[in-house]
């Protein structure tokens, strides 16, 4: 926030007690995230800032006897589109869970709609009672191994650095381009550095030596650590370690053992990708704090990682602490270990009281027009388009890892009839296909997947990272056709079929990524989708839609599928479904 001289004069007058504060919170214990101490003190607020701690009088007072005060929580890396909500609805859920600031990477909508998508996200995030900061997508398209809807170069993104809500460059996923000093990639990095921006990393599967390349290029954090050793490597390299606990990627338990008094201030919490049902039911950063404390992390350390550390990582100098001169974003808690939220304050105003959102603070925000965003375009399909022709029965198969975005590459015998793969629910060998949907080019990439344990039907979605083509997994070609046709009819969405009939769906008309519904209405439809998916045999211990949406992301190990076919992360190339060497 930019302050005028008059505002500074007013805050100084309140701090020096020459003027009363607009609001004083009394009798609470306040967490000092700088020292790690709790102290009973008044919190005086003026012009949306904390003017002072101590003994203060105000025009309005709130008695918080028996309560604790901590800074508003900050999510250091999230893709809003993965929640399937507009920024307006997203902010409502996040505020209820104490998250007053989020740093988002809109590369999902950018891969669909380019700069039109960026404009939508920036405008739709404006005038909300929550800070939504944006990092410019670095890799649109993510790779050359798939078709997406747009391309962004350094010139496209550099103009956005003038926007105060744009912090820097989002996760640099294309490591080969960095390592090979690709001109276009370096132009984006240099432009970001010249504008004083932060550069996020994406170091999935990288060795300790490879991290040197990222650091040399100015990349300063990473959220892809899935093991204790990877976490140590990043901290030793000088990176901020983003500890991710989202809907599919759950790395907290693996990384928590390496956190200690010496390195904790270089660690922050992120969720990356969260689906709506998970967000509504379990929360966001508040959920990570609860779980971390249950696993033995010191509560003060957990709150530092969820607030001050993240603010410092991104250069947000007025956020992350309950201290004089900081923006008055804070939570009043009934219990700090459970993150039991009594009230949420944003800019010194109570925006959530006992779980109820104050809707008046959303009056100034707009439901931003998304009709200019492109609609899906696919060629006319038939069931046989999903068949896989085979010359051998020994095949490369994608094996999902529940609650992870990585996969295993396994090789198994499959049933072949008349030269075509026959799906088997007994062997858990199902068809998966990716249908290009941006320009109607007709590309369909196909493969075999196991781990869904589906006994009948199909599930399909237009959320397919990062190019967001249509992806479908099913027990037969006919089931898959029914599901994809419905996704097309909805202009994008989530679909479950059973006996070739659509049994549940959620329309995502905003770029094929986001619902235009109220978050509670969308949530109810998601519950129905999950229920039918379980009826079809899919286990309930992981989210099949988010899992499916990451089977198309070739920059994550190990075996994936794009609209151009099966993709091997180790060789960074497409491979045949049949195993070429036995």
From Swiss-Prot:
Its cofactor is Mn(2+). One of its GO terms (molecular function) is adenine deaminase activity. Keywords: Hydrolase, Manganese. The keyword Hydrolase applies. GO terms for biological process: adenine catabolic process. It comes from the Bacteria. Pfam families: Adenine_deam_C (PF13382), Amidohydro_1 (PF01979). Its EC number is 3.5.4.2. The keyword Manganese applies. CDD domains: AdeC. It catalyses: adenine + H2O + H(+) = hypoxanthine + NH4(+). Belongs to the metallo-dependent hydrolases superfamily. Adenine deaminase family. This is Adenine deaminase. It comes from Oceanobacillus iheyensis (strain DSM 14371 / CIP 107618 / JCM 11309 / KCTC 3954 / HTE831). The gene is ade.
């Amino acid at each position: 926030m930019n302050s005028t001289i008059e505002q500074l004069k007013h805050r100084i007058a309140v701090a020096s007690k020459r003027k009363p504060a607009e609001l004083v919170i009394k009798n609470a214990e306040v967490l000092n995230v700088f020292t790690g101490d709790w102290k009973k003190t008044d919190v005086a607020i003026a012009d949306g800032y904390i003017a002072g701690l101590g003994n203060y009088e105000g025009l309005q007072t709130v008695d918080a006897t028996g309560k604790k005060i901590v800074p508003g929580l900050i999510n250091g890396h999230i893709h809003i589109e993965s929640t399937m909500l507009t920024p307006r609805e997203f902010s409502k859920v996040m505020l209820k869970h104490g998250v007053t600031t989020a740093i988002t990477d809109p590369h999902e909508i950018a891969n669909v709609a380019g700069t039109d998508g960026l404009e939508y996200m920036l405008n739709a995030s404006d005038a909300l009672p929550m800070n939504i900061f944006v990092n410019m997508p670095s890799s649109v398209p993510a790779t050359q191994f798939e078709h997406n809807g747009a391309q962004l170069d350094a010139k496209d993104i550099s103009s956005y650095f003038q926007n105060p809500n744009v912090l820097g460059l989002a996760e640099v996923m294309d490591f080969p381009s960095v390592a090979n000093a690709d001109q276009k990639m370096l132009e984006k990095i240099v432009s970001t550095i010249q504008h004083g921006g932060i550069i996020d990393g994406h170091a999935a599967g990288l060795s300790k030596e490879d991290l040197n390349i990222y650091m040399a290029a100015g990349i300063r954090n990473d959220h892809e650590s899935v093991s204790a050793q990877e976490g140590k490597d990043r901290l030793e390299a000088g990176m901020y370690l983003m500890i991710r606990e989202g809907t599919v990627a759950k790395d907290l338990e693996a990384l928590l053992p390496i956190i200690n008094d010496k390195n904790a201030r270089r660690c922050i919490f992120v969720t990356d990708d969260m689906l709506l049902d998970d967000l509504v039911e379990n929360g966001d950063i508040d959920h990570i704090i609860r779980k971390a404390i249950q696993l033995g992390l010191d509560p003060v350390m957990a709150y530092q990682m969820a607030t001050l550390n993240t603010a410092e990582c991104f250069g947000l100098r007025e956020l992350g602490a309950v201290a004089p001169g900081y923006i008055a974003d804070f939570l009043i808690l009934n219990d700090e270990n459970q993150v039991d939220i009594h009230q949420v304050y944003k800019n010194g105003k109570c925006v959530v009281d006992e779980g109820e959102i104050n809707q008046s603070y959303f009056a100034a925000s707009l439901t931003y027009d998304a009709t200019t965003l492109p609609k899906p375009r696919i060629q006319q399909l038939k069931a046989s388009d999903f068949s896989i022709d085979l010359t051998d029965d020994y095949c490369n198969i994608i094996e999902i890892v529940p609650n992870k975005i990585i996969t295993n590459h396994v090789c198994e015998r499959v049933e072949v009839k008349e030269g075509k793969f026959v799906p088997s629910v007994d062997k858990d060998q199902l068809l998966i296909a990716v249908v290009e949907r941006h320009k109607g080019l007709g590309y369909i990439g196909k493969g075999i997947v196991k781990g869904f344990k589906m006994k009948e039907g199909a599930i399909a979605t237009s959320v397919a990272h990062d190019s967001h083509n249509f992806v479908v997994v099913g027990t037969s070609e006919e089931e898959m056709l029914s599901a994809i046709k419905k996704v097309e009819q909805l202009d994008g969405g989530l679909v479950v079929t059973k006996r070739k009939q659509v049994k549940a769906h959620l329309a995502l008309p905003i770029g094929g990524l986001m619902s235009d519904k109220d978050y509670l209405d969308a949530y109810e439809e998601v519950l129905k989708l999950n229920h039918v998916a379980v009826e079809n045999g899919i286990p309930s211990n992981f989210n099949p839609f988010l899992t499916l949406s990451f089977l198309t992301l070739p920059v994550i190990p190990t075996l994936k599928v794009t609209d151009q076919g099966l993709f091997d992360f180790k060789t960074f190339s497409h491979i045949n479904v049949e195993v070429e060497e036995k």
